[in-house]
């Protein structure tokens, strides 16, 4: 089974289109694990199983687990999604990243315990996203170099806009490091470093790929100095003290 895991916050229109593209896959043995991260429209996720009856969903609401949000980094809901997942192959992605081609089939055929698949991710403008939602073909996209969030030559970051890893390796890594929970950024960069420390080959995939659908920002200044500085200092410290396994209170092994 393949598990597609997402941390969700107020991206319902984009999520719907992403699920539409996932539902076109030839692979049917798949589950969609979504952790709702205190979003305003989270209750609407509970109807997804009716809208996409051929997809298996596991919807987890953070409001059911704690009264208020005590973190600002998505590493926490992602780790919860990992623990809830059942697949032997895991696709980690943003809910607004729709599939251009059959990522599930490519993952099924090409993911091993020796590699990490990093799918190219193009950042669509609002007008491009609007056209995409009409079902028009992709050639209208500009594909400007500056608009790639992840690309083997233009921006080879290998972050989890859309990536795939085996369950065995995810357990070995113990997911994201939750020491980044109270700050912004660097959790994704640090995961890539630990993937390299584990000896996995990072393979950038140009086809199939994903499009990051445009959305308005729904938070206040994510780069405010104090929280950004906290995570930057932690990241720099961990580069001097390399490790493979995340230092989390709760193990991913429980999944």
Predicted regions and their residues:
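A conserved acidic beta->alpha catalytic loop
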Residues: 36-47, 66, 94-98
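C-terminal catalytic/acceptor-binding lobe
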Residues: 179-255
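Glycine-rich, basic loop-to-helix element that forms the pyrophosphate-binding segment
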Residues: 65-85
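Conserved catalytic core of nucleotide-sugar-dependent glycosyltransferases
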Residues: 82-83, 100-179
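N-proximal low-complexity "stem/linker" segments adjacent to membrane-targeting elements
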Residues: 1-21
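Short aromatic/hydrophobic "clamp" motif used to bind/position activated sugar donors
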Residues: 90
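Short beta-strand/loop segment that forms part of the nucleotide-sugar
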Residues: 29-39, 60-64
